[in-house]
């Protein structure tokens, strides 16, 4: 969906992607831990080739984790410690995972050729990243994924079938249906403030509301981005590695929150907020 695409496309700001204005991801660690950490991160880097540049590698990892979250509602990995100098983080598909507090059971996919047995994994060996609770006040992310595509944005399925059959559909109010779909998705994604790509004022929104949504959505994205950085640093702590990832010169969630509050209070002009956003 467009909602998923927008999260994935905005999780890494353009300034960070291009190292613009000194925006970059940095790793603070001991020199003798650097190779181990880079190998751990590269084991997470499943959809990209092995990366030697640490800034690029960290950005790829953030994208990888977000991709799993927006597809499955969470990102789950198994910690495979071969030795103190060889640790791999293996991605798992969250489907058919059952949490029993002290351990997880992963049910195998159906296979007609051979018998597959459930896999028991200690929770000490699992690393799970979920959507921050602040972004799930009204609806869980999994609920959003289940419901956001249930209505066609153009017309109901039955009406579409009538159209294909050349039946008379002149009495159908397409505009009203479109408005109802907009309201439904707007409510479903209200914790995120997604603008549904409504960038200009129209019959459904005003310019003020559209700008508010743009700030709110970027604020939500920054919350998710900083949450992932926190979880990566927490992973290092679990592995007994003294290291910390941080983003330099990137707009923080607190800065977005402040701008959002000032905009709602009328303490910042349209020109100032547009300049801040772009």
Give residue ranges: language-model regions.
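Structured, contiguous alpha/beta core segments that scaffold functional sites
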Residues: 1-188, 262-278
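C-terminal helix-loop subdomains that flank or include functional centers
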Residues: 56, 194-278
């Amino acid at each position: 969906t467009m909602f998923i695409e927008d999260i994935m496309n905005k999780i890494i700001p353009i300034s960070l992607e291009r190292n613009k204005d000194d925006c970059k991801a940095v790793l603070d660690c001991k020199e003798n831990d650097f190779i181990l950490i880079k190998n751990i991160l590269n084991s997470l880097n499943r959809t990209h080739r092995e990366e030697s540049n640490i800034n690029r590698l960290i950005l790829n990892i953030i994208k990888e984790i977000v991709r799993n979250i927006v597809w499955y509602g969470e990102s789950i990995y198994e910690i495979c410690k071969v030795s103190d100098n060889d640790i791999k983080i293996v991605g798992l598909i969250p489907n058919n995972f059952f949490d029993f507090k002290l351990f997880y059971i992963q049910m195998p996919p159906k296979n007609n050729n051979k018998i597959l047995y459930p896999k028991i994994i200690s929770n000490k060996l699992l690393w799970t990243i979920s959507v921050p609770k602040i972004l799930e006040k009204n609806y869980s992310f999994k609920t959003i994924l289940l419901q956001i595509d249930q209505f066609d944005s153009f017309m109901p399925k039955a009406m579409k079938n009538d159209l294909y059959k050349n039946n008379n559909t002149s009495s159908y109010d397409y505009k009203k249906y479109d408005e109802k779909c907009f309201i439904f998705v707007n409510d479903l994604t209200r914790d995120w403030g997604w603008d549904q790509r409504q960038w200009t004022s129209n019959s459904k929104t005003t310019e003020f509301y559209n700008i508010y949504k743009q700030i709110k959505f970027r604020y939500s994205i920054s919350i998710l981005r900083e949450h992932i950085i926190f979880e990566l640093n927490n992973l290092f702590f679990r592995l007994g590695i003294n290291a910390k990832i941080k983003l330099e010169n990137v707009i923080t969630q607190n800065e977005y929150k402040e701008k959002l509050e000032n905009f709602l209070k009328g303490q910042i002009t349209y020109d100032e907020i547009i300049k801040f956003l772009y």
